[in-house]
Amino acid sequence: MTGLDRLSYQSRWAHVAPQRKFLLWLAMMILAFVLPPVGQGIELLIIAGLSCWLLRISLWRWCRWMAIPFGFLLVGVITIIFSISREPQMLLAGISVGPYWIGITRAGVVTANETFWRSLTALSATLWLVMNLPFPQLISLLKRAHIPRLLTEQILLTWRFLFILLDEAVAIRRAQTLRFGYCSLPNGYRSLAMLAGLLFTRVLMRYQQMTTTLDIKLYQGDFHL
């Protein structure tokens, strides 16, 4: 069980109907797109406080979860701020590179500010939904939304194999660590290469075991969701 999945089961709203959670998330997303940057910042603070209270976690831990997508968002915002132009008077600040100027424009700063707060608020709302929606409730929500059965089964299998992959990786790395496989940088690279090779082999073996189990149970191509 991953950290996010474990948190979703300890949420104060773990047993609240998934439809209500989805509707609340939808309202959060609509507000994230229609509010001005100041309103988006206020919504972000409300979502952060609600997430910490529901999940019984500290604000620091929530910020660490948000730091993962924040890095990608920051790179995107930086690319919006900077522009290339032949007319330096259009730039607030810039440097010349041959016949071109690279710098910051007023429109770029405004767009970057709006994009930053809108995206960060939408990300926090989506993270709230993920951390408060256990996987069985997600499957139930997909069924109620009449998502094609094949797609739902694919999501279920992908989720299962994700856990298999993580379990095998943790077991192999623990065994390598006990044998001082990561005591130095060269040994670490060597152990990492061995982990990748063993992981591929063991996941294939687990897949074959699951296929055999399904055949024994007279699997006809449909999972009972």
Curated annotation (Swiss-Prot):
Subunit structure: Forms an energy-coupling factor (ECF) transporter complex composed of an ATP-binding protein (A component, CbiO), a transmembrane protein (T component, CbiQ) and 2 possible substrate-capture proteins (S components, CbiM and CbiN) of unknown stoichimetry. Expression of just CbiMN in E.coli confers some cobalt uptake.
Physiological role: Part of the energy-coupling factor (ECF) transporter complex CbiMNOQ involved in cobalt import. The complex confers cobalt uptake upon expression in E.coli; can also transport nickel with a very low affinity.
Membrane topology recorded in Swiss-Prot or TrEMBL: Multi-pass membrane protein
Regions crossing the membrane: 22-42, 65-85, 90-110, 122-142, 150-170
Sorted UniProt keywords: Cell inner membrane, Cell membrane, Cobalamin biosynthesis, Cobalt, Cobalt transport, Ion transport, Membrane, Transmembrane, Transmembrane helix, Transport
Family named by the database record: Belongs to the CbiQ family.
Pathway connected to this protein: Cofactor biosynthesis; adenosylcobalamin biosynthesis
UniProt-recorded name of the protein: Cobalt transport protein CbiQ
Keyword Metal-binding: no
CDD domains associated with the record: EcfT (cd16914)
Location within or outside the cell: Cell inner membrane
Cellular component, GO annotation: ATP-binding cassette (ABC) transporter complex
Entry keyword Transmembrane helix: yes
One GO process term, biological-process aspect: cobalt ion transport
